[in-house]
Amino acid sequence: MPLAITSYEFSLFLHITAVVVGFGATFAESVMFPVAMKMSARYLPYVHRLQLTLNQYFAVPALIVVLATGFYQVSEGNWELGDFWISAALAIVIVIALLNLLYFIPADRRLAPMVEREVADAGAGDVTLSAQYRREATREGIAGTVTGILLVVAIWLMVDKPGA
């Protein structure tokens, strides 16, 4: 029996793969900062560079693929953009995209050099993180938690399709 896959099924495969690859890596960000702090604040520049890389090269392309394949699935499937589960998931994806582009990426671009300076200023001694750095890093952690919850809600909407 030959392997046959429809364009809709392929789109669904791309959609799910983009979510797993693009956003799965970002869930690991929630443990990067605490692990770095347990080891040494000297690892924090790496944490911010890694988060920047994950957000720019994994999450942003994933958002594009998720949106493109999602719109394709709505147009080819028996769905309407006005369906609650689709509208809510689309709103969540837009919020996550905006958070990523307007908050997370700029925050890591700001925090990485800030903490690099603080590490350099410490020389061989203990690193003392500034109040500004701690405040901004805490804010980023809270925003990351909210984003993670939004992602889980979007996945639930896609799987359960309430109202469909």
Regions found by a protein language model. Give the residues of each.
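Polytopic transmembrane helical bundles with strong interfacial aromatic enrichment
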Residues: 1-164
